[in-house]
Regions:
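Short, conserved loop/helix-junction motifs that constitute active-site signature segments
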Residues: 108-114
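An alpha-beta-alpha
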Residues: 120, 124-135
Length: 142
């Protein structure tokens, strides 16, 4: 199986790198027929104007059977590089298309449905406020 790991943490000594990614790599290396490729968004210095890098990322997404996202959550958001990755790689025409329902309404149809996705998100906040906010997000109306 082809595995793609996308890391969105700037610190090479972080738990995202040494804990989560290290464990995924060890497990996959211990099993036969497992290929692993890694995208380190901070090491690659991803910026919106890096078209060659973004095209390479799209090729890796197509290549993969499984995609692992590893990122801290800062101020209840993904890191800027991870957000840039989603904005620039998973674009209409590549990851999905809009299917019209009416002239003014459409829904997205995925081109990546067969991919298996796992997300590993870390945070430094106490768990109670995080769980309270995330579990009640659908109840909060701003």
């Amino acid at each position: 199986m082809k595995n793609l790991v996308i890391i969105g943490h700037p610190d090479q000594n972080s738990f995202c790198h040494n804990g989560i990614f290290g464990k995924i790599k060890k497990i996959l290396n211990d099993h036969p027929n497992q290929e692993i490729k890694t995208i380190d968004l901070y090491k690659d210095k991803l910026h919106r104007d890096k078209k060659d890098l973004i095209n390479n990322y799209k090729k890796l997404v197509i290549w993969s059977d499984r995609i692992y996202f590893i990122s801290p959550v800062w101020w209840f958001r993904l890191t800027p590089k991870m957000e840039t990755f989603f904005d620039e790689v998973f674009t209409p025409g590549f990851a999905y298309e809009f299917v019209n329902i009416t002239k003014t309404y459409a829904y997205p149809r995925s081109f990546l449905k067969k991919k298996k996705i796992r997300c590993y998100l870390t945070h430094g906040a106490p768990s109670l406020p995080v769980k309270t906010i995330y579990l009640n997000l659908s109840l909060i109306h701003i």
